[in-house]
Amino acid sequence: MPDDLTPDLLIRAYANGVFPMGDDDTGIVRWHAPDPRAYLPLDAFHIPHNLRRRVRRREFSVTADRAFASVIEACADRARTWITPRIIRVYTELHERGYAHSVECWQEGDLAGGLYGVGLKGAFFGESMFYRVSNASKVALVHLVRQLRAGGFTLLDTQYSTEHLERFGVTTVPRPAFEQKLIRALDVSPDWWPLADAEAADLDTPVSEFSAAAPTLRGNESPPNG
């Protein structure tokens, strides 16, 4: 693929199951299409018991698209990272166009953790997550999955599998099988973030029973106080 990294190129790449990663040393962006490909079946998401208890206690306030820049910069803030300045720039542009999204966990007004990814029709491509308070990124993932299911998404791509992700139900399929799942997802027109925070945290109630819609929160709004 060409080296000119633009939002339009990214959208086309994701629609074909391809994603970029930057080289921390050279800044070069390389394109990836793993085989096998990892994804999280939304109807088989497993929440460990201890995490389920934390979500129910609502230790964090959870929002979407309220602090995208802070989330992606926090995800990049580690000793070695593929989230280079070029990656940050183009994903920020994607966010401004409504394709890249962040999920934030707040505690007493401070950003405690979160994740970001790309939403394209009925597919969500998870990119990275971080935490400053224990379990904050996991709580963000729980809320993301609840919201995706409620909104009608059909595919949550995790790109690669890790032992950590497998605890939540992540599995792998051959690349051709993933591409078929992606094709079906691209025929879906879902709603982004339809549930209120309390509804997403109510793990005892199926998401299908909620009908109230919460507005999508954009990155220029102020963080909550707790």
From Swiss-Prot:
It is found in: Cytoplasm. The keyword Cytoplasm applies. Its EC number is 2.3.2.6. Pfam families: Leu_Phe_trans. It catalyses: N-terminal L-lysyl-[protein] + L-leucyl-tRNA(Leu) = N-terminal L-leucyl-L-lysyl-[protein] + tRNA(Leu) + H(+); N-terminal L-arginyl-[protein] + L-leucyl-tRNA(Leu) = N-terminal L-leucyl-L-arginyl-[protein] + tRNA(Leu) + H(+); L-phenylalanyl-tRNA(Phe) + an N-terminal L-alpha-aminoacyl-[protein] = an N-terminal L-phenylalanyl-L-alpha-aminoacyl-[protein] + tRNA(Phe). GO terms for molecular function: leucyl-tRNA--protein transferase activity. It comes from the Bacteria. The keyword Lipid metabolism does not apply. GO terms for biological process: protein catabolic process. It is an enzyme of class 2 (transferase). Keywords: Acyltransferase, Cytoplasm, Transferase. GO terms for cellular component: cytoplasm. NCBIfam families: aat. Belongs to the L/F-transferase family. Functions in the N-end rule pathway of protein degradation where it conjugates Leu, Phe and, less efficiently, Met from aminoacyl-tRNAs to the N-termini of proteins containing an N-terminal arginine or lysine. This is Leucyl/phenylalanyl-tRNA--protein transferase. The lineage of its organism: Bacteria, Pseudomonadati, Rhodothermota, Rhodothermia, Rhodothermales. The gene is aat.
